[in-house]
């Protein structure tokens, strides 16, 4: 599992070493550049390495576990130094970013030959090309292709009680903003899970807010409050959008403007003056999506398990997408279930169409597999970090979009007409940038380098001038081979070779024993000695130097032409950025929709009926993750019904669920919450039938964990989460509560649970499932008109308990705790003693009975005898050794009679 992003800000010194008069030109340049980026590690390009110096080197060597060396002196002290290779620096960047560092990447911006023209001691010009931070990553090697990487900004103005929260995915251009009440901030941050969060320094004064932000998991970047000033932000936004007024994009609150302005400033800062191709900002209303707080998301294991793993989460169980963009769209839908029934049903219409059109679904998914990630390729091109492969991704993505659109347009007449959701996506793709796609396909070669500077990415025949220059370059290389043969023949040295490196250029190389021959007449007149090595001597000639010059000119000119063509193609692509972004979104949505249809067909899910009622009727509901896990082992999940609807459930919108541990209460609670989320994200659900009235807020208090960092016990955490539910839940909410009040004294816990149920019933009036071991609460069904009792069915057999995992009306008559403890393997004396204590408590419960129990404890009487060794019967021994899969019917019947005889003998 990858390391999570942290809110730790590494200490990088803001006061840097002064530049002494005797500093080398290189070190003087380094210190000058570092002074401009004091809070980041500086990757200083030195040839094929990025080198770090001073405290940067100390911090990086420790974080990366690489060698710390030294290079020269500063003010009489050794300068610490470490470095990483340029060709593999992405891996080191990723590790530093995940440990909370920011990295300023400083590149050489001129050729060393140009620097030498200014003087022998001139240093190559360098400049920071970008600031790499957790929220501004664009490279595929640094990103998860199947997850968004949001940079968010939080703002609050004195005149407004709430917050403005803006977010952008620099790698795709997604840009949005919303206004939030303070109580809703945690839920929204949990939904977005940003990689980095910008906030004004003044917000640190709010201790409760600081604690909430620290829990978000995002790297926190504090900026001067002036960066969030709404007037300045509005001007910045208008300039970015190229408009004189923002009315066409929505009526933004001051806090929203401040957050968006800070985002744009920070993106431009980190990209050193360049801006990615961002979509126009969309304003998201808090009521558009189901509110799910951080605790509920964690308890329900929506995107990762409680152990932090992706496998075993709801997202991993549901994901059938075939593209990275489709996976991101699916994750976004799961994170933000919709609350508008019409919007949800449009999604369900599209899923149903693909569900029924099996052949078209298979054809579409096969076509999508060849669709690259247009959005991320476009972002890299807009930031000047794109390469030939990004242009090819655009071309191939457009080709896939056009092909899929044609396939959908030509769908079989036997199918229903395209639903609105699919027709809209098709319209976004139809004919998009067709001329650009044709041009890119014609210009690009089949085999493409990663970087444009490597050349060779323009197809032969695409540019006559380039073809001519390449021919000259390639012919010159043939002349080199001919010249080598000529020199070998003239000198009689068969081992003579003409080689090339970046220092000497082309040179003649011979073994040392033949070198003396070339140093003596008559060869010394034409062969000029260049270098002596341990195992070779190197020479040149005027003829070779002239030919090398022509080759260099031809090769340089060919690369120059290719780079110019690349710039032309990139510029033409960026002109189509808006339509390309729409096509990329359409492909992602089609992938997510078809994937949900594939899942529904594979797992026998059904379309839920979703409307504006207060219904919550599930027939044959199943837990999607548990069902999938059981299916892998050949087991079946036991389905259960739920009815929390005032309309059809006899007015019972709260169920009080009792039953033993291990009987399936928590699974039942969670499965209903997950079914609600799946339905409102626009997915079919694991049930035989489902009718759900829109849920506006989902609350879950399931499981137990302490919060030692903030001085909170398990019980305190439980009470804080319960308080949030009781203070925020409403009539449209769905509440899942498990074992409220168990972390304190029995009567205290019972009292809290009792009062909580009454409050949910009379004040919140929410649809709720309340699991408890306090059987006394079942009496509330006689007092509260909208509460019903339900229990997990069990059977007892020969003193053991068998869990049926079935929910039935009524209340449990006992908890079966001792039987569960026995299953867990508690020692036999402990089980026996527990049974006797329970019997005594059930008989009376008065003070004298409890005193007698204490007097009977082994501590005050005699040490308990060890449990007798369990004798294994002959029948049990026989059962242990048999393999059912190897028995024929006749053998099985004979064995049955044998076991019966052994059992009878054992019982004597």
UniProtKB/Swiss-Prot annotation:
UniProt similarity note: Belongs to the DNA mismatch repair MutS family.
Q: Species name for this entry? A: Parvibaculum lavamentivorans (strain DS-1 / DSM 13023 / NCIMB 13966)
Q: Could you mention a single GO BP entry for this protein?
A: mismatch repair
Alphabetical UniProt keywords: ATP-binding, DNA damage, DNA repair, DNA-binding, Nucleotide-binding
HAMAP family from the entry?
MutS
Instruction: Please give the NCBIfam families that the UniProt record associates with this protein.
Output: mutS1, PRK05399.1
SMART domains under this entry? MUTSac, MUTSd
Gene name of this polypeptide: mutS
Write down what this protein is called.
Answer: DNA mismatch repair protein MutS
Q: List the disulfide bonds.
A: none
Keyword check for DNA damage: yes
Stored InterPro entries: DNA_mismatch_repair_MutS, DNA_mismatch_repair_MutS-lik_N, DNA_mismatch_repair_MutS/MSH, DNA_mismatch_repair_MutS_C, DNA_mismatch_repair_MutS_clamp, DNA_mismatch_repair_MutS_core, DNA_mismatch_repair_MutS_N, DNA_mismatch_repair_MutS_sf
Q: Please name the Pfam families in this protein's record.
A: MutS_I, MutS_II, MutS_III, MutS_IV, MutS_V
The entry marks the following residues as binding ATP, namely 659-666
The organism's superkingdom is given as: Bacteria
For this protein, the record's CDD domains field holds:
ABC_MutS1 (cd03284)
Provide a Gene Ontology MF annotation, just one. Answer: ATP binding
Q: State the PROSITE patterns in the record.
A: DNA_MISMATCH_REPAIR_2 (PS00486)
* GO terms under cellular component: cytosol
Query: Do the record's keywords include DNA-binding?
Result: yes
């Amino acid at each position: 599992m990858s390391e999570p992003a942290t809110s730790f800000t590494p200490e990088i010194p803001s006061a840097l070493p002064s530049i002494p008069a005797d500093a080398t030109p290189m070190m003087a340049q380094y210190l000058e550049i570092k002074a401009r980026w004091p809070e980041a590690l500086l990757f200083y390009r030195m040839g094929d390495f990025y080198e770090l110096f001073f405290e940067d080197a100390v911090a990086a060597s420790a974080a990366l576990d690489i060698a710390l060396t030294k290079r020269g002196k500063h003010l009489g002290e050794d300068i610490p130094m470490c470095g990483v290779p340029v060709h593999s620096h992405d891996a080191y960047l990723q590790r530093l970013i995940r440990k909370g560092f920011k990295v300023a990447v400083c590149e050489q911006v001129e050729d060393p030959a140009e620097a030498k023209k200014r003087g022998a001691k001139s240093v190559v010009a360098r400049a920071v090309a970008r600031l790499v931070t957790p929220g501004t990553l664009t490279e595929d090697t640094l990103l998860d292709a199947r997850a968004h990487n949001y940079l968010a900004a939080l703002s609050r103005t004195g005149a407004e009680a709430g917050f403005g929260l803006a977010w952008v995915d620099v790698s795709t251009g997604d840009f949005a903003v919303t206004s939030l009440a303070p109580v809703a901030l945690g839920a929204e941050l949990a939904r977005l899970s940003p990689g980095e969060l910008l906030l004004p320094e003044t917000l640190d004064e709010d201790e409760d807010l600081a604690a909430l932000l620290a829990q978000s998991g995002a790297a926190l970047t504090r900026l001067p409050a002036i960066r969030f000033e709404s007037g300045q932000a509005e001007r910045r936004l208008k300039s970015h959008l190229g408009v004189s007024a923002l009315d066409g994009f929505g009526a933004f609150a001051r806090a929203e403007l401040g957050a968006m302005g800070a985002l744009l400033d920070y993106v431009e800062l980190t990209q050193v003056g360049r801006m990615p191709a961002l979509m126009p900002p969309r304003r998201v209303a808090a009521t558009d999506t189901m509110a799910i707080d951080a605790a509920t998301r964690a308890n329900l294991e929506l995107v990762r398990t409680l152990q932090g793993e992706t496998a075993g989460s709801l997202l991993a169980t549901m994901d059938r997408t075939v593209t990275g963009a489709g996976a991101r769209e699916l994750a976004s839908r799961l994170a933000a279930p919709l609350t508008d029934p019409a919007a949800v049903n449009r999604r369900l219409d599209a899923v149903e169409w693909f569900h029924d059109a099996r052949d078209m679904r298979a054809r579409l998914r096969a076509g999508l597999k060849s669709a690259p990630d247009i959005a991320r390729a476009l972002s890299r091109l807009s930031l000047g970090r794109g390469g030939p492969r990004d242009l090819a991704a655009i071309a191939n993505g457009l080709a896939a979009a056009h092909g899929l659109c044609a396939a959908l347009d030509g769908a079989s007449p036997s199918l229903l007409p395209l639903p609105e959701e699919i027709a809209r996506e098709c319209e976004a793709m139809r004919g998009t940038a067709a001329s650009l796609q044709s041009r890119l396909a014609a210009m690009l070669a089949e085999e493409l380098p990663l970087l444009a500077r490597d050349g060779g990415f323009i197809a032969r025949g695409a540019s006559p001038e380039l073809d001519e220059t390449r021919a000259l370059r390639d012919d010159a290389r043939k002349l080199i081979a001919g010249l080598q043969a000529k020199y070998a023949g003239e000198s009689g040295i068969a081992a003579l070779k003409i080689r090339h490196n970046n220092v000497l250029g082309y040179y003649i190389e011979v073994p040392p024993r033949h070198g003396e021959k070339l140093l003596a007449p008559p060869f010394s007149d034409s062969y000029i000695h260049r270098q002596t090595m341990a195992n070779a001597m190197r020479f040149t000639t005027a003829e070779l130097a002239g030919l090398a010059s022509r080759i260099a000119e031809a090769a340089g000119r060919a690369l120059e032409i290719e780079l110019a063509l690349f710039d032309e193609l990139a510029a033409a692509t960026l002109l189509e950025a808006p339509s390309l972004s729409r096509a990329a979104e359409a492909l992602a949505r089609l992938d997510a929709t078809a994937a949900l249809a594939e899942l529904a067909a594979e797992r026998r899910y059904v379309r839920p009926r979703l409307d504006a009622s207060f219904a919550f009727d599930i027939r044959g509901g199943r837990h999607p993750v548990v069902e999938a896990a059981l299916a892998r082992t050949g087991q079946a999940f036991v389905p259960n019904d739920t009815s929390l609807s005032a309309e059809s459930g006899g007015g019972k919108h709260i169920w009080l669920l009792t039953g033993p541990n291990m009987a399936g209460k928590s699974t039942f609670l969670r499965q209903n919450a997950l079914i609600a989320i799946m339905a409102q994200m626009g997915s079919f659900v694991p049930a035989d039938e489902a009718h759900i009235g829109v849920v506006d807020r989902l609350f879950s208090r399931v499981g137990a964990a302490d919060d030692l960092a903030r001085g909170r016990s398990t019980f305190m955490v439980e009470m804080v989460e319960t308080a949030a539910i009781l203070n925020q839940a409403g009539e449209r909410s769905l509440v899942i509560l498990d074992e409220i009040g168990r972390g304190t004294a029995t009567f205290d816990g019972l009292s809290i649970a009792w009062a909580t149920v009454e409050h949910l019933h009379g004040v919140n009036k929410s649809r709720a499932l309340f699991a408890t071991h306090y059987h006394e609460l079942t009496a509330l069904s006689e007092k509260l008109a909208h509460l019903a009792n339900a229990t997990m069915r069990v059977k007892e057999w020969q003193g053991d308990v068998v869990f049926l995992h079935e929910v039935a009306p009524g209340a449990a008559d006992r908890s079966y705790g001792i039987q569960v403890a026995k299953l867990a393997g508690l020692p036999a004396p402990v089980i026996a003693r527990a049974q006797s204590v329970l019997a005594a408590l059930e008989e009376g419960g008065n003070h004298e009975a409890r005193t007698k129990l204490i007097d009977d404890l082994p501590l005050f009487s005699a040490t308990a005898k060890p449990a007798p060794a369990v004798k294994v019967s002959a029948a049990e021994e026989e059962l242990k050794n048999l393999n059912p899969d190897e028995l024929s019917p006749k053998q099985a019947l004979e064995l049955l009679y044998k076991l019966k005889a052994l059992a009878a003998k054992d019982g004597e």
